Amino acid sequence: MNVLLPQPIETEAISLLEEKNCIVTTAPDPKPETVLPLLKDAHGLILRTGITINRELIEHADELLVISRTGGGLDNVDVSAATEKGIIVTSNLGVNTVSVAEHVLSMILALSKRLILLDNAVRNGNFGIRYQNLPRDINGKTIGLLGFGRIGCEIGRICHQIFDMQVIAYDPYLPDGKKAEYRSWVTFAELYELLSKSDVISIHVPLTDKTRHLVGDAEFSLMKTDAILINASRGGVVNETALVKALQNNQIAGAGLDVFSEEPVPADNPLLQLENVILTPHTAALTKECVTRMATEAAKCVLDVFDGHEPQNVANPQVLESGRWKRLQADRSSQNC
């Protein structure tokens, strides 16, 4: 079976595939025009974030059985087109939870303690900045979580248990029964209430039509002037123009961004000129340990499909009822007899 990698993945995952006699092809680059001809013979595709697998590409993938995302998001896959084609789409929900949570907490602390500003001051001979008392504690403060899935929950847990922070969450999609499990330490509230009461606001929602520009001018006007905003979900959730204005006008104290509306970030993006922002290049989940976990789990999903087994975290379970999937299962079952 042929497995296509639009971008390189960890050697541990490639070894896993090759041990099962898969032929692994890595594209020279993740451009659509490069990947398209390689899709013709691919049975499995392991996908990172460097390319969007759109309808046009999927229509050329006649042999493709599975698209396996290394991460949890599916905004770079046309799931509807894949479903129509009978292609299983899987994601890696939960695999990057701890790594992303650690990254977010690092940003919260770095912004609150003004680490980058103080580091630059010392390097430039301004040791006297210590008398300005710029750092702030987070202990006992309030963190607001936009989205209370795995990552949001983990960040809230750490902030509550370690820093004695009050936790407010906004998640209209979380069932009431599930919310009840957390009410001993989480207050679920409407968005406006969360924004007005939180000292730290951290975003953990997927990018959809409903969440695009979820945070804009109106939302920034509700925030405390000493609040900090963290976004490690998707760039489009925050209106960057409104964010720049809020930072320039001191509507909020600072922001930590791992994601952007356009990636890579253009050289003329005004965020690059602001001192009250920490920017990282979409690396919250890209620790050595996490990328290995994500790649190997994505490879396991591909192998499960090849073996006729239902993989984990199927985004389009209706494909499992299709004739194509039933025939694959029957074929693999007969081979094992």
Describe the function of each predicted region.
Residues 1-90, 196, 216, 222, ...:
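An N-terminal-biased, well-structured beta-alpha scaffold segment characteristic
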Residues 2-3, 22-26, 97, 168-170, ...:
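Structural/interface elements that position substrates and couple domains in central-metabolism enzymes
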Residues 50, 72, 199, 205-207, ...:
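Short glycine-/small-residue-rich Rossmann-like dinucleotide-binding loops
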Residues 58, 62-65, 77-89, 203, ...:
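Beta-strand-loop-alpha-helix segment that lines the small-molecule cofactor/substrate pocket
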Residues 85, 93-142, 154-158, 162, ...:
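Phosphate-binding beta-alpha-beta segment of Rossmann-like dinucleotide-binding domains, i.e.
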